[in-house]
Amino acid sequence: MLRSTLSRSAWRTGRHQAARNASRAFSATAQRPAEVELTIDGKKVSIEAGSALIQACEKAGVTIPRYCYHEKLMIAGNCRMCLVEVEKVPKPVASCAWPVQPGMVVKTNSPLTHKAREGVMEFLLANHPLDCPICDQGGECDLQDQSMRYGGDRGRFHEVGGKRAVEDKNMGPLIKTSMNRCIQCTRCVRFANDIAGAPELGSTGRGNDLQIGTYLEKNLDSELSGNVIDLCPVGALTSKPYAFRARPWELKKTESIDVLDGLGSNIRVDTRGLEVMRILPRLNDEVNEEWINDKTRFACDGLKTQRLTIPLVRREGKFEPASWDQALTEIAHAYQTLNPQGNEFKAIAGQLTEVESLVAMKDLANRLGSENLALDMPSGHKPLAHGVDVRSNYIFNSSIVGIESADVILLVGTNPRHEAAVLNARIRKQWLRSDLEIGVVGQTWDSTFEFEHLGTDHAALQKALEGDFGKKLQSAKNPMIIVGSGVTDHGDANAFYETVGKFVDSNASNFLTEEWNGYNVLQRAASRVGAFEVGFTVPSAEIAQTKPKFVWLLGADEFNEADIPKDAFIVYQGHHGDRGAQIADIVLPGAAYTEKAGTYVNTEGRVQMTRAATGLPGAARTDWKILRAVSEYLGVRLPYDDVAQLRDRMVEISPALSSYDIIEPPSLQQLSKVQLVEQNQGATATNEPLKKVIENFYFTDAISRSSPTMARCSAAKKTGDPRTNFMAPGMEEDRPMGQIAYGA
């Protein structure tokens, strides 16, 4: 839902200037700001003018208690827990809302400060229920921690009617509410309105009657809604799927990355035994800040349903369990019987495949004489229109954080709200705080920012670039064109890339400079950039059209089934019994991203790694080890025996893969022009409209399609009713894989 123009303009008024300056998330300036010197607890501190006093205290190494203040949110000043004493000021001041001033003398631990905080804590606890033994926030609750220091041993609040009681709200299948615990810090409201763009969440009433909720019972319509759980400093908002399942001290914590979209959000995987209990975000300001999308957070229950745990061999139309030796022997026998020549062996890689497995699969295919490699796409396996030899052709060149410097953005064939929800929040942030203008070529969607719709086909793109919006891009200091998967999967892809490439090349003075590259490709799948890095692509249309006799599906579930001949022998290697496994002759159980250490490259070219948080279920094996074993049975033994040797092979193919958490800048931008323009010269367009590549945000991969929680979200989104049951009649499309209706 769009914010009103009045709401957007309020960000630019003087009334909100201090709050904007006080939030580190919204500070961006080309010049070094003036410094202010002040004294905090006898220590001299220098900090940027306009910073909040609480930030100066943090710089001095002093931890200030707070509930409403958060570095990424606008200032509210609700809780008053951050009170400090300032000399020559008659009363304690809220350090989150008080800007620093030259020569200030601040005392953060004086008797006056301590007494003031004790008073605030007493008011907060006056109506707070004693739910700690049954509250999911127990053990990681800010109110618990701070009450140990500032709470009294008894309360003075007595009322005949008892403590305030507030009815719990139903916000959908993800967020569990216990509104008696709410301390009205409004973190959730500010996040929903300012970051997520979901103004349904707000406050009603005032004083003792103030309540947080959606007013009308409805879902919190945002792909980022789960972040309010992390923001809530008490147990008012907790995870509904995680309710009463574990305590934080019982969990093993593993730092990893998300692979359910192309962003590579940094996450922490909490496990107990072999089960992933929950997934939380990790701070990385260059990628996901502190946010993750709901699919990343809640689809983890899909890791334990529909899992492949033993090899399966299809006999007489039915799968039968087999040992690894039996399954690999069957594969070798089928290969010898069919005797595929060269490119008649085809390998298709899925969206969640890590670089190690891609390299092993590529080397195996090459040793068998085949170059017929493909990525699973519903549109088929033709070569990418824009070529993949130069990094700037397939990555987000401006970088994710570069969005916060853009002044004009053109979105072509992409819906960032579904393809990269956290990146979409960056666009919204820049739109709110600046005069950012956004144009869209493609199908529209329920956006969190205002945009100018320029059309849906190639002709509309040409008209836009030749018209007023093209002039805006030409005159912008930091223009951005973001090309999405809707273009790559479209029949007019060649024409789209030629048109965009010509425009970028003719305006290189502001699109391609030493400081800025405004051409960006938004990859929606975690494996895409890594596949292009190691050359896991079909080199020509002729090879792609070769009829295969033997097909290897490496975690591939999004393929076009018409591209696979009915008489081909199919091996599916993956971790879920999804679409690929259903058509396979042999199924080999692999590892999910939480069960292996694997290399992924995100949409901006940043190399990152998952880490094994749990062991492998049943007889499942790490994917590259499976391919290594297969190579011996096929008589083309791969030359690496451990993962270190395999990663040396990766770096041999692409040296950029040796630098983790670093974006290697493209060194041959002019060659990019050759591939974008000259390779597509004279491409004709059918002017078919661009289509949405993601119809259902909650069912985009094998893990999320197996998740009961994602099924509940899909059903609730479809009906608009948070109480919808996905097993009810009429909800067949919104069920997880393998589920049947009542009574069936």
Curated annotation (Swiss-Prot):
Instruction: Describe how the cofactor binds.
Output: Binds 1 [2Fe-2S] cluster per subunit.
Where does the chain bind [4Fe-4S] cluster 1? H128, C132, C135, C141
Cited Pfam families: Fer2_4 (PF13510), Fer4_NDSU1 (PF22151), Fer4_Nqo3 (PF22117), Molybdopterin (PF00384), NADH-G_4Fe-4S_3 (PF10588), NADH_dhqG_C (PF09326)
Q: Where is the 4Fe-4S His(Cys)3-ligated-type domain?
A: 112-151
Cellular location of this protein? Mitochondrion inner membrane
Q: Which SUPFAM superfamilies match?
A: 2Fe-2S ferredoxin-like (SSF54292), 4Fe-4S ferredoxins (SSF54862), Formate dehydrogenase/DMSO reductase, domains 1-3 (SSF53706)
Broad EC category? translocase
One Gene Ontology term from the biological process aspect of the record: ATP synthesis coupled electron transport
Give the residues the record marks as binding [4Fe-4S] cluster 2: C182, C185, C188, C232
| Domain 4Fe-4S Mo/W bis-MGD-type as annotated: residue spans | 251-307
Quick one: which residues bind [2Fe-2S] cluster? Answer: C68, C79, C82, C96
Q: Where is the 2Fe-2S ferredoxin-type domain?
A: 34-112
Keywords on this record?
2Fe-2S, 4Fe-4S, Electron transport, Iron, Iron-sulfur, Membrane, Metal-binding, Mitochondrion, Mitochondrion inner membrane, NAD, Oxidoreductase, Respiratory chain, Transit peptide, Translocase, Transport, Ubiquinone
What catalytic activity is recorded?
a ubiquinone + NADH + 5 H(+)(in) = a ubiquinol + NAD(+) + 4 H(+)(out)
Molecular function per GO: 2 iron, 2 sulfur cluster binding; 4 iron, 4 sulfur cluster binding; metal ion binding; NADH dehydrogenase (ubiquinone) activity
Compositionally biased spans, kind Polar residues:
1-10
**Into which family does the record put it?**
Belongs to the complex I 75 kDa subunit family.
NCBIfam families noted in UniProt = NuoG
Q: How does it assemble?
A: Complex I is composed of about 40 different subunits.
Name of protein: NADH-ubiquinone oxidoreductase 78 kDa subunit, mitochondrial
Identify the gene encoding this protein: nuo78
